[in-house]
Amino acid sequence: MASTASYSPSPTSQWRTQKLPKRFNFYVIHNQEFGKLSQSSSLPTSSFPKTLKLPVIQMPINNNIQSQTTVCVSTDENLEELVNLQKIANGVLTKESNKRVFIQDPPWVSSLFMNSLFVRAKQVQGVRREFREIERRRRYAMLRRRQIKAETEAWEQMVEEYRELEREMCEKKLAPNLPYVKKLLLGWFEPLRQAIEKEQNAETTVKHRAAFAPHIDSLPADKMAVIVMHKLMGLLMMGGKEERCVQVVQAAVQIGMAVENEVRIHNFLEKTKKLQKHMTGAQSQEDMSRETMILRKRVKSLIKRNRVVEVRKLMKSEEPESWGRDTQAKLGCRLLELLTETAYVQPPVDQSADTPPDIRPAFRHVFRIATRDPGKSIVKKYGVIECDPLVVAGVDRTVKQMMIPYVPMLVPPKKWRGYDKGGYLFLPSYLMRTHGSRRQQDAVRSVPTKQMQQVYEALDTLGSTKWRVNKRILSVVESIWAGGGNIAGLVDRKDVPIPELHSDDIMEVKKWKWRVRKSKKINQELHSQRCDTELKLSVARKLKDEEGFYYPHNLDFRGRAYPMHPHLNHLSSDLCRGILEFAEGRPLGKSGLRWLKIHLASLYAGGIEKLCYDARLAFVENHIDDILDSANNPLNGNRWWLNAEDPFQCLAACINLSEALKSSSPHTVFSHLPIHQDGSCNGLQHYAALGRDSMEAAAVNLVAGDKPADVYTEIALRVDHIIRGDSIKDPATDPNALLAKLLIDQVDRKLVKQTVMTSVYGVTYVGAREQIKRRLEEKGLIDDDRLLFTASCYAAKVTLAALGELFQAARGTMTWLGDCAKVIASENQPVRWTTPLGLPVVQPYFKTQRHVIRTSLQVLALQREGDTVEVRKQRTAFPPNFVHSLDGSHMMMTAVACRDAGLQFAGVHDSFWTHACDVDQMNRILREKFVELYSMPILEDLLESFQNSYPALTFPPLPKRGDFDLVEVLESPYFFN
């Protein structure tokens, strides 16, 4: 058989053919054979091309030919058309009886071939898409099973772990290799389990059990023991005002709640086990209800559940009434009492064999004196569970063994559909953090679903953002932490030394006691910070190998969104923000590379963040070598990144930029880094938009400018000017003169920033004083505590006065809001309003009522929401709460719009995040939504709602509004930057 040649038809060539029959096979011959064939055939020579170019496609000619002759026919550039194909076939086949005819590449044949190829490719692509979809569903189902197991079997797994450790200890003596905390918990587990089991089996009267240990037998003793130990240790790690202790009422209620939640799941599983066990042969699956089948499958294998929604409905329909805080506290107290009786620690010191070991209780129940009321002889006491210093030391070193509830989810959260419908698959999830305010709960529950739809969508959008752990940053953090911390903002892992007394002088002893108190307080704060860091790192370690995870969000009562997981989240510290990144990567693009550089400069801060964009870009270009060195050698190089205000986020940006700069095509490098766009003193931005004041709008970047306006620097300059003026006055006539001299050259942006930031949220004089005092302490230029206090008082007054001068319109709006709240609260009514997105808000400030209950441990005084409003709190809290509800609305509106535009979005109140390549689009959206929000008659609607709700009351008139045009916000490059 001859070889194949190629042919490219002339543009002018045309084919006219007859439809050819099927079932013909053709072969290709060489040019020489074709020439011989043409000479021996009856075909004219001009009918054949001068140069033979044969395609791969083969065509049949005639289905009634007996013999086979092969003839190759092609077009030539000088040939206009071929002779009729039937004539060719007849002529050839009469001369050569054993040959066939082969037809070469007409356009319609090529079209058929390409069309067939295209159809085939589409089929292959479709199959691939189907396989990808099948794989996606398979992986989702696997992750969903893991998530359900994590939510429902956590305590069960901990119990099994303790049992396994006990077996290994007996067989292999593994105790010396266990972490310290694990040793403690393992040592407490069996005695506590036995004590609980004994309590469960005790022949006590129903009345006695109801009074002191209700529901003590509602869970297996081993599971209850694990819950008590871990909840108490978790509370101790969270830290608080007290050193090495936690209040009994707090611990008891928390433990009672944890037991109740586990009881619901446990009872549900036990019930389905009994259903399965007592099924007779006659009771086939067909006879069972759909619900029973689901229950049985769930018990048989939690991992294989696929009907989570139906199961939750069944659980909810069969749930008993909530225990209530009284019952929770009673049970919690009894379990705490059993723990204090059975848990012991032994100091790790060498002791002689003939000396009994120094074993002492790990926990003690003691009473402490509350702050005495002046002029009253009654001393108030409260009970605490105090832990031994050895327990604190162990907790300080490691918390890897602690079980943390509400960890980030492996699958997207359930969409919100109601007050308690959404978030985690099985763990109790509530739309709003009401902190026990029944009025707020009732308000949210009573609102139609349609009215809340925008809020639900926003929370779903925030919860659908997929995150992952930045392993390179985590590795750097772990290295620093293992080395003792104390750099890059990490807390020092060593306590400050307690000063020793070297004199018997009364004054020296007094000073020594004060220094000891101060050192202990510092160490207490360090301990709390170390526990917090360990909690964050423990979650990061657990999630570092996951492809991605999600944060279910809910709201505070004002409508601000928060992740439900409290430790490792993007609302937290620089440590958390540096460790977290988007799971999805997107190419930087030209604009993304620019924004990455701007982002890096802003994170470095030190005043760089207040420069124009071009200056920030120039800063990065001038430090390229430092950036590359930081990325390549973060701990052993020149460590430039450590000088940044947000060091870990800065390092993450250095690494991302380094990857781009090393690439031959920087714009195509994928980036997972969230790029921030932050509001400029966002509370004042909202007040400026409400009041339409042009001067205030310019001060907070609602108006376009060549560089960002810095309101903090502006206030600092005003404060410095006032202080310098006071410093030249006569101290005999003006007592502030000496304080002013003391503060010269100490006033800067940092000194006043927090006070300015919180002024719009209703900061009081006392609050401002404490904020400024902390900044002055950090400077360390005033040693005397009394002098530091008086200087802080003076600086706070001056700062608030400067604020009042610059933001008069904002003060007017704040005053109007406060006056309206006072009118309402004077009628013993809480202030209520509805946010622009339809969320009802009720201020939860009521005088509390004390409710005393007797427990086995002590008498507890539980506080409940009363019926009398706190007038002062209702008035002072309303302005900041109202503005918070507005900034929450702006963030949620932006989140939904970004989702609709295909952007990944994360929000931190007044800081919006997305991929570098999408920053320009997000900037446009957030400005449009701000203008849309404040184009609504917000204050007018608020006043109308007050008048409709309280027609008998008289409210002050609306504050005057300025002439600022909101449209200018759309053109302001530094509104968010």
Swiss-Prot record:
So which domain of life are we looking at?
Answer: Eukaryota
Pfam families membership: RNA_pol (PF00940), RPOL_N (PF14700)
Q: Where is the active site?
A: D678, K753, D910
Its principal location? plastid
Where does this one sit in the cell?
A: Plastid, Chloroplast
Which one GO biological process term can you cite for this protein?
Answer: mitochondrial transcription
Q: Which InterPro entries match?
A: DNA-dir_RNA_pol_helix_hairp_sf, DNA-dir_Rpol_C_phage-type, DNA-dir_Rpol_phage-type, DNA/RNA_pol_sf, RNA_POL_N_sf, RPOL_N
Instruction: Cite the residue span of the transit peptide.
Output: 1-72
**S-adenosyl-L-methionine as a keyword?**
no
The Gene Ontology CC terms held by the record are: chloroplast; mitochondrial DNA-directed RNA polymerase complex; plastid
Which catalytic reaction applies to this protein? Answer: RNA(n) + a ribonucleoside 5'-triphosphate = RNA(n+1) + diphosphate
Question: What is the tissue specificity?
Answer: The highest levels of expression are detected in the mature leaves.
Name the enzyme group at the top EC level: transferase
Q: Which GO terms describe its molecular function?
A: DNA binding; DNA-directed RNA polymerase activity
EC number(s) reported in the record: 2.7.7.6
Known PANTHER family for this protein? DNA-DIRECTED RNA POLYMERASE 3, CHLOROPLASTIC, DNA-DIRECTED RNA POLYMERASE, MITOCHONDRIAL
Similarity comment: family membership: Belongs to the phage and mitochondrial RNA polymerase family.
- What is the purpose of this protein? DNA-dependent RNA polymerase catalyzes the transcription of DNA into RNA using the four ribonucleoside triphosphates as substrates.
- What is the protein name for this chain? DNA-directed RNA polymerase 3, chloroplastic
Q: What is the lineage of its organism?
A: Eukaryota, Viridiplantae, Streptophyta, Embryophyta, Tracheophyta
